[in-house]
């Protein structure tokens, strides 16, 4: 497939704001590939259309920011001054290169047209270049590609290198196109995506005319992590009991969600962003290897522990462990970790369609029980032990008095609150479900994404000192909810400034517009209505709790979350 043909279709997708038209244009791509390409092309096109070169679970990125791309563009014959002026005018490196493409020095008039496979494989190769002179090699590869490209191709090559296609395509839109073209119920395709986390693989398999629902590659598989099921926020235990009908209460741990995969003695541990953190937590890996059970996918919360008092250490200690690449043994001695497992998703076969009470029974056959109402003495002894692997503390009851006592106890041992789960519920990957909710004593912190940064004043004059923060809407749009600068140390500011300079899209002089990649966890005094922002709400006195490197834009809170927290707090007042 010629890359120019692909570009012409995705330009139509980019130019229409209407979702149904985007679906129709993507159907056009599927049909073109079916008649003129091969299934592997559709796999790659699906990834490229959502601004990714690799599947999300592969935990790989091209790793090239705007600054390095600009350096490469300058070697093609476009002057730095012209490029900067055009970027300031358009706010888009891709369109800027397209507009200035007449200034690119062409190698030859007799170049063969670029194919999609050629562009994709070349850009994919960029992620493998490491070591000395790696930047020079990357610049040379990008430059050679742009010199061969025609104007529209240069736009999308530049964007793909940044893994930001800006055409308004997302997973649900592609799944809808699959449903339309192949005549398969959208719900069935959505379920397959939930257990594969690989939109490209689904497209490839559909074109291969495989038995879609029976194909083993499209089932839940060990070492291919899936997105976690997410909980709703509920204002009170009373409402949770009514909502859940058949409730199980579990401690809500002050930790980080992890997914543990084990098969044939090999163990991998993934963060909630599906990042492979196995090498950072060797002591946990060894404990899991020693378990008799094999061929499993387990889900739990990883907690940094103070073993002297049995209480959790600050959340940032977990991130320090997850990020550590060197001196891991030393860090293992400094920060003790344990995992509280609360679900099992796979044991020789997928278990996510089983009700929670059955999955919990299977889990407890591996790790033992931790029934708070029956085994409190054992639990309190184990909390202060060196044991690393537990089942989550739980109590199954509709008795409000017991539930409230369990909530207070969970807070007393240093954790955030409780989870309330419907024992009859199945596991739905990647969805925020009504069959699971969380109850916390304090205001729910928000995970937000940084969309702009401003140069600071006084002691902060050398860094970006203030950050515009946003939450997501239903259509994946971003809504500004405030600006934050408090809570950040000098070390944080230095780190954020470095990242911001790597991902800035436009420099406005003292302020930069950023790719939405930095996730912050913020606390605040309250959520208030506000005419200042389009969404109608603003955070009063926001303060940064932490830089959430374990989360992506997919994990940030939504406008609906903000509305719900606002209503909960209004009722409490």
UniProtKB/Swiss-Prot annotation:
<feature type="binding site">
    <location>
        <position position="301"/>
    </location>
    <ligand>
        <name>ATP</name>
    </ligand>
</feature>
<feature type="binding site">
    <location>
        <position position="257"/>
    </location>
    <ligand>
        <name>ATP</name>
    </ligand>
</feature>
<dbReference type="GO" id="GO:0003910">
    <property type="term" value="F:DNA ligase (ATP) activity"/>
</dbReference>
<keyword id="KW-0067">ATP-binding</keyword>
<feature type="binding site">
    <location>
        <position position="438"/>
    </location>
    <ligand>
        <name>ATP</name>
    </ligand>
</feature>
<dbReference type="InterPro" id="IPR016059">
    <property type="entry name" value="DNA_ligase_ATP-dep_CS"/>
</dbReference>
<dbReference type="InterPro" id="IPR012308">
    <property type="entry name" value="DNA_ligase_ATP-dep_N"/>
</dbReference>
<keyword id="KW-0547">Nucleotide-binding</keyword>
<keyword id="KW-0233">DNA recombination</keyword>
<keyword id="KW-0436">Ligase</keyword>
<feature type="binding site">
    <location>
        <position position="272"/>
    </location>
    <ligand>
        <name>ATP</name>
    </ligand>
</feature>
<dbReference type="Pfam" id="PF04679">
    <property type="entry name" value="DNA_ligase_A_C"/>
</dbReference>
<dbReference type="InterPro" id="IPR000977">
    <property type="entry name" value="DNA_ligase_ATP-dep"/>
</dbReference>
<keyword id="KW-0479">Metal-binding</keyword>
<dbReference type="InterPro" id="IPR012310">
    <property type="entry name" value="DNA_ligase_ATP-dep_cent"/>
</dbReference>
<feature type="binding site">
    <location>
        <position position="432"/>
    </location>
    <ligand>
        <name>ATP</name>
    </ligand>
</feature>
<dbReference type="GO" id="GO:0071897">
    <property type="term" value="P:DNA biosynthetic process"/>
</dbReference>
<dbReference type="GO" id="GO:0046872">
    <property type="term" value="F:metal ion binding"/>
</dbReference>
<feature type="binding site">
    <location>
        <position position="250"/>
    </location>
    <ligand>
        <name>ATP</name>
    </ligand>
</feature>
<comment type="function">
    <text>DNA ligase that seals nicks in double-stranded DNA during DNA replication, DNA recombination and DNA repair.</text>
</comment>
<dbReference type="GO" id="GO:0006281">
    <property type="term" value="P:DNA repair"/>
</dbReference>
<keyword id="KW-0460">Magnesium</keyword>
<feature type="active site" description="N6-AMP-lysine intermediate">
    <location>
        <position position="252"/>
    </location>
</feature>
<keyword id="KW-0235">DNA replication</keyword>
<keyword id="KW-0234">DNA repair</keyword>
<dbReference type="InterPro" id="IPR036599">
    <property type="entry name" value="DNA_ligase_N_sf"/>
</dbReference>
<dbReference type="Pfam" id="PF04675">
    <property type="entry name" value="DNA_ligase_A_N"/>
</dbReference>
<keyword id="KW-0132">Cell division</keyword>
<dbReference type="Pfam" id="PF01068">
    <property type="entry name" value="DNA_ligase_A_M"/>
</dbReference>
<comment type="similarity">
    <text>Belongs to the ATP-dependent DNA ligase family.</text>
</comment>
<dbReference type="InterPro" id="IPR022865">
    <property type="entry name" value="DNA_ligae_ATP-dep_bac/arc"/>
</dbReference>
<dbReference type="GO" id="GO:0003677">
    <property type="term" value="F:DNA binding"/>
</dbReference>
<dbReference type="InterPro" id="IPR012340">
    <property type="entry name" value="NA-bd_OB-fold"/>
</dbReference>
<protein>
    <recommendedName>
        <fullName>DNA ligase</fullName>
        <ecNumber>6.5.1.1</ecNumber>
    </recommendedName>
</protein>
<dbReference type="GO" id="GO:0006273">
    <property type="term" value="P:lagging strand elongation"/>
</dbReference>
<dbReference type="InterPro" id="IPR050191">
    <property type="entry name" value="ATP-dep_DNA_ligase"/>
</dbReference>
<dbReference type="GO" id="GO:0005524">
    <property type="term" value="F:ATP binding"/>
</dbReference>
<feature type="binding site">
    <location>
        <position position="342"/>
    </location>
    <ligand>
        <name>ATP</name>
    </ligand>
</feature>
<keyword id="KW-0227">DNA damage</keyword>
<dbReference type="GO" id="GO:0051301">
    <property type="term" value="P:cell division"/>
</dbReference>
<dbReference type="InterPro" id="IPR012309">
    <property type="entry name" value="DNA_ligase_ATP-dep_C"/>
</dbReference>
<keyword id="KW-0131">Cell cycle</keyword>
């Amino acid at each position: 497939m010629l890359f120019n043909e692909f570009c012409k279709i995705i330009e139509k997708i980019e130019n229409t704001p209407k979702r149904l038209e985007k679906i129709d244009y993507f159907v056009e791509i599927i049909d073109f590939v079916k008649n003129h390409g091969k299934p592997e092309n559709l796999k790659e096109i699906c990834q490229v259309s959502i601004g990714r070169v690799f599947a999300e679970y592969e935990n790989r990125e091209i790793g090239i920011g705007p600054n390095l791309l600009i350096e490469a563009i300058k070697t093609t014959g476009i002057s730095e001054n012209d490029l900067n002026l055009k970027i300031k005018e358009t706010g888009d490196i891709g369109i800027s290169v397209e507009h200035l493409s007449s200034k690119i020095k062409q190698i030859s008039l007799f170049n063969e047209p670029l194919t999609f496979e050629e562009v994709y494989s070349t850009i994919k190769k960029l992620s493998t270049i490491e070591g000395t002179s790696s930047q020079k090699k990357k610049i040379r590869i990008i430059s050679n590609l742009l010199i061969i490209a025609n104007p529209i191709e240069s736009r999308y090559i530049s964007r793909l290198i940044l893994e930001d296609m800006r055409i308004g395509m997302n997973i649900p839109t592609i799944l809808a196109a699959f449903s339309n073209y192949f005549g398969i119920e959208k719900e069935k395709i959505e379920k397959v995506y939930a257990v594969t986390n690989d939109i490209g693989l689904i497209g490839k398999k559909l074109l291969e005319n495989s038995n879609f629902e029976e194909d083993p590659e499209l089932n839940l598989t060990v070492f291919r992590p899936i997105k976690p099921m997410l909980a709703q926020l509920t204002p009170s235990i009373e409402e949770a009991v009514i909502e859940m009908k058949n409730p199980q209460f579990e401690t809500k741990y002050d930790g980080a969600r992890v997914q543990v995969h084990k098969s044939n003695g090999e163990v991998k541990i993934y963060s909630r962003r599906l990042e492979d953190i196995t090498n950072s937590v060797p002591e946990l890996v060894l404990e899991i290897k020693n378990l008799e059970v094999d061929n499993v996918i387990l889900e739990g919360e990883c907690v940094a522990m103070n073993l002297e008092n049995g209480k959790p250490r600050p959340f940032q200690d977990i991130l320090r462990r997850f990020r550590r690449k060197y001196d891991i043994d030393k860090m293992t001695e400094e920060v003790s970790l344990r995992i509280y497992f609360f679900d099992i998703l796979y044991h020789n076969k997928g278990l996510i369609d089983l009700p929670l009470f059955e999955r919990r029974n299977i889990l407890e056959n591996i790790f033992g029980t931790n029934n708070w109402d029956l085994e409190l003495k054992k639990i309190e002894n184990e909390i202060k032990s060196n044991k690393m692997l537990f089942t989550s503390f739980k109590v199954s009851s509709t008795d409000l008095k017991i539930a409230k006592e369990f909530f207070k106890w969970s807070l007393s041992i240093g954790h955030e609150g409780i989870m309330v789960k419907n024992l009859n519920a199945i596991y739905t990957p990647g969805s925020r479900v009504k069959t699971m909710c969380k109850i916390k004593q304090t205001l729910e912190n928000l995970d937000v994404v940084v969309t702009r940064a401003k140069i600071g004043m006084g002691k902060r004059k050398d860094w970006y000192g203030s950050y515009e923060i946003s939450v997501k809407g239903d259509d994946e749009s971003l809504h500004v909810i405030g600006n934050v600068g408090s809570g950040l140390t000098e070390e944080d500011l230095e780190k954020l400034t470095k990242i911001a300079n790597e991902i800035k899209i436009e420099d406005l002089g003292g302020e930069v517009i950023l790719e939405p990649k930095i996730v912050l966890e913020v606390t605040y005094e309250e959520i208030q209505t506000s005419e200042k922002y389009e969404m109608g709400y603003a955070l009063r006195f926001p303060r940064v709790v932490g830089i959430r490197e374990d989360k992506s834009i997919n994990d940030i809170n939504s406008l609906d979350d903000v509305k719900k927290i606002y209503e909960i707090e209004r009722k409490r007042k």
